[in-house]
Amino acid sequence: MNVKGLVFSTISCFFILASCATKTVPPKTITKVIRDTVIINSKTDQPEMTRAAKLEKYKVTTDYYPSISQDERVRFLVLHYTAINTELSLKVLTQKDVSAHYLVNDYDDKTINLLVDETKRAWHAGVSNWKGLDNLNFSSIGIEIVNLGNKGTDAYPNYTPYPDYQIKKVGELAQDIIKRYNISPFNVVGHADIAPGRKPDPGPLFPWKKLYTDYGVGAWYDETDKYIFMPQYPWDTTSPIFITQVQTDLKKYGYNVPTNGIIDTQTKNAIIAFQMHFRPEKYDGVVDAETWAILKALNKKYNP
């Protein structure tokens, strides 16, 4: 796609007024830095905005508002790469058909773009499934990360690395989101995890382990557990019993796979997505001892 000649004239800032109060709600902002760290305004620091009916003949009261019987829409955080540059990403994500709540550019600056309000449904996940739930657009926040993705082919991939300054932005932003919505570690996923075979992003070079160790974001296995499980690897990887157990373990962790005892396309795609996430040095769709042990270790930690 030729992006030359694209000119972005303005980026508008929207200020929202509470419909039922006289106070002006400050715009949702991502402020600047302390010690080279992106600082994000907390959701709880802003006045609560209420959407409710306005009737001419009746008064809708808030005398008993809010009920305690409620929870957040957001249960998942989904990370993507755009596969295009920042300027084109902003253009694509603000037009029809596709969007995300946030865009993290690839500039060494202190800016993150908010594109869709967190209370709204962004169109980023598409056909997706995680933990038995379909259509994750309804229940997730999506972060698009500017990254050119695979510049090679499927047979000879050449994925684009992520610079540290960009991961700092992603880490701080994701940390803020999961804290506010109490998102479980195993519900911080990549697009590849929720749409195996259809989407590869954020790819094998995305530093999931760094996100976990430096920011407490997402899930990661304990090395000790991995090494405990590895000697238990049964080696008979062609056995329907073994394959069914692998499928059961993948499903338990969150992947949408059958339990038919066959390494079919759906199962292999899920294994590749899993390996990209947790063992990116080799993502061939083969359940070797390390892949098997990592899967066991993750379920021991998060799904006992």
For each of these PLM feature ranges, what is it?
Residues M1-T10:
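Bacterial N-terminal signal peptides that target proteins for export
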Residues P234-L298, P304:
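Short acidic, glycine/serine/threonine-rich helix-capping segments at coil-helix boundaries
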Residues I183-R198:
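Acidic/histidine-rich, metal-coordinating catalytic segments
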Residues Y65, S89-L90, N129-G132, D154-Y165, ...:
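Second-shell loop/turn segments in exported
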